[in-house]
Amino acid sequence: MIEELAGIDIRINEPLKKYTYTKVGGPADYLVFPRNRLELTRVVKYANNHSIPWIVLGNASNLIVRDGGIRGFVIMFNKLNTVTVDGYTIEAEAGANLIETTKVAKFHSLTGFEFACGIPGSVGGAIFMNAGAYGGEIANIFLSAKVLTPEGDIKTMTAREMAFGYRHSAIQKSGDIVISAKFALKPGDFEQISQEMNRLNYLRQLKQPLEYPSCGSVFKRPEGHFAGQLIMEAKLKGYRIGGVEVSEKHAGFMINVDHGTAKDYEHLIAHVIETVEHNSGIRLEREVRIIGEQESLNQKEKS
């Protein structure tokens, strides 16, 4: 198989915890780093022709990969990271770092992207989740995207076709994968943009446990409430299972403090959901995605 995909960076049985923000995750059968669209389509069409499962991880930020890892091809877009500016429009490849993309907007005195200046992850992942913070979200500036269909074809999707909602986009169900996207910004003042980004980054550092590995915001915001507040009222701040605990700094975050596992994360999430519902009557809904397989007995014996 590797011979047919010669020239493409493919790593066999690669531990995914080396690449995830949570620092958990078992091995990928084949971890693939395409350098361009041609390599990407080669991999996807090969996988489809040979009935090999494939998945795109983006930058693996708002995500938990189970300890058993992922079968088939796991495609990471780190090398698809070009960002260009044309007038008031920014075009970014899906693997571009979201924070770095907001810095490009600032450099060109373009406003509208400030809300995302501290959101970790990739541009593609941000579109997938309609990422947002501090009153802004991707849907507000999204123009269009080139996407790869599950069949391996490339098409363009408009903002209307994306059907954005709160932490939702149409591609969560369709299986289409963002390759690149265009964002419509407005001319602004460099100093004002810089000041706003500095303010938002200060708030993030003040309120969020950025010094620890985490999957970001674990739960969606319940209507009329804040997940972190509900978790705090349930007296779960600092609650720990294995190496993962509810952050003392922000109860909406779960941090990997001591060689935690995906199993620790899953058990802690389930405990928080159950306890908060018992305490408040409100059932929290996960924002973080959980993918992959549970660790098998053979894998445990080898580890």
Curated annotation (Swiss-Prot):
Cofactor: FAD
The UniProt record lists the keyword NAD: no
Enzymatic class: oxidoreductase
Catalytic reaction equation(s): UDP-N-acetyl-alpha-D-muramate + NADP(+) = UDP-N-acetyl-3-O-(1-carboxyvinyl)-alpha-D-glucosamine + NADPH + H(+)
Pfam families reported in the protein's UniProt record: FAD_binding_4 (PF01565), MurB_C (PF02873)
InterPro entries (alphabetical): FAD-bd_PCMH, FAD-bd_PCMH-like_sf, FAD-bd_PCMH_sub1, FAD-bd_PCMH_sub2, MurB, MurB_C, MurB_C_sf, Oxid_FAD_bind_N
Locations listed in the record: Cytoplasm
Statement: the UniProt record of this protein carries the keyword Protein transport: no
Domain called FAD-binding PCMH-type: residue spans: 23-188
Keywords recorded for this protein, A-Z: Cell cycle, Cell division, Cell shape, Cell wall biogenesis/degradation, Cytoplasm, FAD, Flavoprotein, NADP, Oxidoreductase, Peptidoglycan synthesis
Signal peptide: none
Pathway this chain belongs to: Cell wall biogenesis; peptidoglycan biosynthesis
GO biological process: cell division; cell wall organization; peptidoglycan biosynthetic process; regulation of cell shape
Gene Ontology MF, one: UDP-N-acetylmuramate dehydrogenase activity
Active-site residue numbers: R167, S217, E287
E.C. designation(s): 1.3.1.98
GO CC terms in record: cytosol
PANTHER family the record matches: UDP-N-ACETYLENOLPYRUVOYLGLUCOSAMINE REDUCTASE
Role this protein plays: Cell wall formation.
Family label: Belongs to the MurB family.
Protein name: UDP-N-acetylenolpyruvoylglucosamine reductase
